[in-house]
Swiss-Prot record:
Predominant location: cytoplasm
One MF term in the entry's GO annotations: magnesium ion binding
Protein family per UniProt: Belongs to the P-Pant transferase superfamily. AcpS family.
Pfam family, one: ACPS
Name of the gene this protein is made from: acpS
Domain of life: Bacteria
Annotated EC: 2.7.8.7
InterPro entries linked: 4-PPantetheinyl_Trfase_dom, 4-PPantetheinyl_Trfase_dom_sf, ACPS, Ppantetheine-prot_Trfase_dom
Annotated Gene Ontology cellular component terms: cytoplasm
Localization per record: Cytoplasm
Keywords: Cytoplasm, Fatty acid biosynthesis, Fatty acid metabolism, Lipid biosynthesis, Lipid metabolism, Magnesium, Metal-binding, Transferase
Protein name: Holo-[acyl-carrier-protein] synthase
Positions of Mg(2+) binding: 8, 57
């Protein structure tokens, strides 16, 4: 069952301006080390950051909190699976919120789609609760996004 949905669009030019104006202060405030390494190594650096920024906004909406109630930027890290598919690594308040959203007897699955076409970057996040009989036997802290 779907327990959360979020979507966001980001103007890449806005991220270009933030990178030029604030540099590392901006990237260190909003992005994880993994995200910074990935984006800084790309020719389309600003577009890469913009997709991740939109993904974080969409994730915070799917969690039902926005960027408040203990959910912070760097607690929602966009990571890529070996196949290249983007997904999230959630920590701190974001992970706690995911645990609280997930019904007993279920495990969470977070789905992420990101794209860009200058000057726009867009992200969609769906949080799904999958039935899992083993989830009844596990303490809540074993959930991983």
């Amino acid at each position: 069952m779907i327990i959360g949905f979020g979507v966001d669009i980001c103007d890449i030019r806005r991220i270009e301006d933030s990178l030029a104006r604030f540099g590392e202060r901006f990237t260190q405030r909003c992005f994880t080390e993994i995200e910074r390494a990935k984006s800084d190594g790309r020719a389309g650096r600003a577009a890469s950051y913009a997709k991740r920024f939109a993904a974080k906004e969409a994730c915070s909406k799917a969690l039902g909190t926005g960027l408040r109630f203990g959910v912070a930027w760097r607690e929602m890290g966009v990571v890529n699976l070996p196949s290249g598919k983007p997904t999230f690594s959630l920590t701190g308040g974001a992970l706690n919120r995911l645990k609280n959203l997930t019904p007993l007897g279920c495990r969470p699955a977070v789905h992420l789609s990101i794209t860009d076409e200058y000057p726009w970057a867009q992200a969609q996040v769906i949080i799904e609760a999958l039935e899992d009989p083993d989830a009844l036997l596990q303490p809540p802290d074993v959930f991983e996004a």
